[in-house]
Amino acid sequence: ITEGVLTRMIQQDPELTGIDAIVFDEFHERSIHSDFGLALALEVQSGLRDDLRLVVMSATLDIAPLQTLLNGFSLLPVVNLETQGRMFPVDVRYTRDVQAYELVAKTSNLIKQAVSEHDGDILVFLPGRGSINAVAREIKGLADSADIAVQMLYGALGKSAQQAAIAPDPQGKRKIILSTNIAETSLTIEGVTVVIDTLWENSAQYHPSSDITALTQQRISQA
C-alpha cells in the first residue's frame, strides 16, 4: 500500500486491528508522505499498540539518524540488521542533450543501437504514457523482425500488464521495457543489461496565473 493509504487506515482504525507489523520499504526515497506515515505509526505504537512492530528498510540510507529517531519514540527495542549487497560494474555513457521535440526519435534510435550492440533486456525510462506509446510505435518494426517483446510500465496500467513487464517473457523472448520512473528505484527487473534514461519526467506543476495544477514535461535534475 502507499503511505497515503496507510494514513487513511490509521484515521479509520487508529488501533490498526489485525495488523502486527508495518514495513516501510525503500525509506531513502524520503517524502512528506513517508515521514508522516512513520510518525503516525510511531504514535499508534506509543499510544495504542505497544505490540506493533515497525520495520524500516533501505539499501542506501544512513541508518544512524533514523536509529536515533526510533530510539526516542519507539517503545520496543530498536534492532539494526544489515545484509551484504552485490555490486556490479556499470559502464555509463552520455549522449548530447536531447530536446523535448526530438525525444521519441532519439530514444528510438538509441534502443535500436542497444539491440544491435548488446545482449539481454533493455529498460528505457520515459516521461509518461504518451511518449511510451510513441516510442513503442517507432520500434514496432524492429521488435517484430528481431522477435523482441515490447512491454510498457506505468502507474495507470492494470496489475497483469505490470506483472508482464516485470516477469521474464514466457516465450523466452528478449524484452524492451518502456517505463516511467515508477521502476527507477522501487522495482527489480531481472535480465536487464542496458538502461536508457532520457532524464525527462512528467511532474505536477502549479500555474498561479490560471490557478491550475497540470502535468508538465521537464528535465530531471538534482539541483
What residues fall within each predicted segment?
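P-loop NTPase motor module signature
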Residues: 1-223
